[in-house]
């Protein structure tokens, strides 16, 4: 099945967040992890989501409707960008927190992880938060084309240890690596086909603390 994305609406404030009955999968990740590029790769369009070499480009919650299936992929603001103001980071944190807490149709959280980097604390915090709160987790390594095959394998193993044996998918927006596999996982997640990982022993369960951690 061939799917694409249509940008339906964008929310910059808490009041602009919308309530949808259709299943939703949130995309989360550090600033400059390649979320916008991945959205474009999924949509097979170059400029659906604006990309930038400057971290922190996505400062809103973007709702993309998946056609023809009808579920939504929701792109959340990137976290960990130290160059923006503290007030701006707090604003993003509240926006992310409100979305996750209030979204009754959230089917899972796709966390994007830079394949070039060892597991980062903010990413570990977010994946632990998802597992502790029984949010089905889909870990995705981005920029796989920037790493050698051995590096990809090593990074998958590192994350598997942290995620109870779950290896993340490897993707590359520029080459299309892993995009078809990612679509299969997203469809299954939207349909409720993936179960949540086992709860992490030391994972934070309080929403505001966890979200503040990853946006601080």
UniProtKB/Swiss-Prot annotation:
UniProt GO BP: division septum assembly
Cofactor requirements of the protein: Mg(2+)
Entry-linked CDD domains: YihA_EngB (cd01876)
Gene3D superfamilies hit by this protein: P-loop containing nucleotide triphosphate hydrolases
Keyword GTP-binding tagged: yes
Positions with biased composition (Acidic residues): 196-216
Highest taxon of the lineage: Bacteria
Gene Ontology molecular function: GTP binding; metal ion binding
Cell division found in the keyword field: yes
Alphabetical UniProt keywords: Cell cycle, Cell division, GTP-binding, Magnesium, Metal-binding, Nucleotide-binding, Septation
Region annotation Disordered: where it falls in the sequence: 195-216
Chain ranges of the EngB-type G domain: 21-192
List of residues binding GTP: 29-36, 56-60, 75-78, 142-145, 170-173
PROSITE patterns to which the protein is assigned, alphabetical: G_ENGB
Function: Necessary for normal cell division and for the maintenance of normal septation.
Alphabetized PANTHER family for the sequence: ENGB-TYPE G DOMAIN-CONTAINING PROTEIN, MSS1/TRME-RELATED GTP-BINDING PROTEIN
UniProt family annotation: Belongs to the TRAFAC class TrmE-Era-EngA-EngB-Septin-like GTPase superfamily. EngB GTPase family.
The protein's name: Probable GTP-binding protein EngB
The organism of origin for this protein: Nitratidesulfovibrio vulgaris (strain ATCC 29579 / DSM 644 / CCUG 34227 / NCIMB 8303 / VKM B-1760 / Hildenborough)
